[in-house]
């Protein structure tokens, strides 16, 4: 994997930093694992904007990823690594011994030809998926379930991982990258190793158009709006907003806690680190 800093041959190239992975498949994705993905433009069924800064962008197919890893006892071989426009991580196309193909997240160090497996009898090695009760304390894992059988929800982005720090009774304690310590049932599955493509964070798009290709629209400052559009809007001439920063709906935007899921508070042993 190479990091390329473009020469300033134009204003649009001056700040571009690319991450080039020569191991990725250059052809089309596996057609049997593609699904239609339609654009919403950030609108809901009534046509109102519910998510700002969304719209446009290149057409995409959704890749159906196996986040459950429940084909126990059937060995599989990694056929190739592929780019996925729907996530920061790369994905791997695996061929099981029974002839079925599936996409999974590509772990760090995974290559074409690697053998992987899932289940309680799987070996402790990168790419294998096991229940947390069978994973040694201190191990680094990714794609962790929060409920048994629901599918992976934690540590799915490029370069992320979770460490198993303890196991007590029916719960395992995990340390997340944010610093949060969280309890998860030991029957939840996780995949050994880190998510690959950690260099993703080093890339620089370099120009506004590269954001538009990805379906991201501009962000307008509140102080540049009218009073009807934002609490910071209006005023004669340039203003600083006149109050502590808030969202367009008046919610404080710097350091204000908005978590309200009391049902799962008991599973959080320690809150995440302050930025």
Curated annotation (Swiss-Prot):
GO terms for cellular component: large ribosomal subunit. Pfam families: Ribosomal_L2 (PF00181), Ribosomal_L2_C (PF03947). Residues 223-275 are annotated as: Disordered. InterPro entries: NA-bd_OB-fold, Rib_uL2_dom2, Ribosomal_uL2, Ribosomal_uL2_bac/org-type, Ribosomal_uL2_C, Ribosomal_uL2_CS, Ribosomal_uL2_dom3, Ribosomal_uL2_RNA-bd_dom. It comes from the Bacteria. The keyword rRNA-binding applies. One of its GO terms (molecular function) is rRNA binding. One of the primary rRNA binding proteins. Required for association of the 30S and 50S subunits to form the 70S ribosome, for tRNA binding and peptide bond formation. It has been suggested to have peptidyltransferase activity; this is somewhat controversial. Makes several contacts with the 16S rRNA in the 70S ribosome. Belongs to the universal ribosomal protein uL2 family. This is Large ribosomal subunit protein uL2. It comes from Shewanella woodyi (strain ATCC 51908 / MS32).
């Amino acid at each position: 994997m190479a990091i390329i800093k473009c020469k300033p041959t134009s204003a649009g190239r001056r700040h571009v930093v690319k991450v080039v992975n020569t191991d990725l498949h250059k052809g089309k994705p596996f057609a049997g694992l593609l699904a239609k993905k339609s654009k919403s433009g950030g609108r809901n069924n009534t046509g109102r904007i519910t998510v700002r800064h969304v719209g446009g962008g290149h057409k995409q197919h959704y890749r159906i990823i196996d986040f459950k890893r429940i084909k126990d006892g059937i060995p599989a071989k990694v056929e190739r690594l592929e780019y996925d426009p729907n996530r920061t991580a790369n994905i791997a196309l695996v061929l099981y011994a029974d002839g079925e193909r599936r996409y999974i997240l590509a772990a760090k160090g995974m290559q074409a030809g690697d053998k992987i497996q899932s289940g309680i009898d799987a070996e402790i090695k990168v790419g294998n998926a096991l229940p947390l009760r069978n994973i040694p304390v201190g191990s680094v894992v990714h794609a962790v379930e929060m409920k048994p059988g629901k599918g992976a929800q934690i540590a799915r982005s490029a370069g992320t991982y979770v460490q198993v720090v303890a196991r007590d009774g029916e719960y395992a304690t995990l340390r997340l990258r944010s610093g949060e310590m969280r309890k998860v049932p030991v029957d939840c599955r996780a995949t050994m190793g880190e998510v690959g493509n950690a260099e993703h964070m080093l890339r620089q798009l370099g120009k506004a158009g590269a954001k538009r290709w990805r379906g991201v629209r501009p962000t307008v400052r509140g102080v540049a709006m009218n009073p009807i559009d934002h609490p910071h809007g209006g005023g004669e001439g340039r203003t600083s907003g006149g109050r502590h920063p808030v969202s367009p709906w008046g919610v404080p935007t710097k350091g204000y806690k908005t978590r309200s899921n009391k049902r799962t508070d008991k599973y959080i042993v320690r809150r995440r680190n302050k930025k």
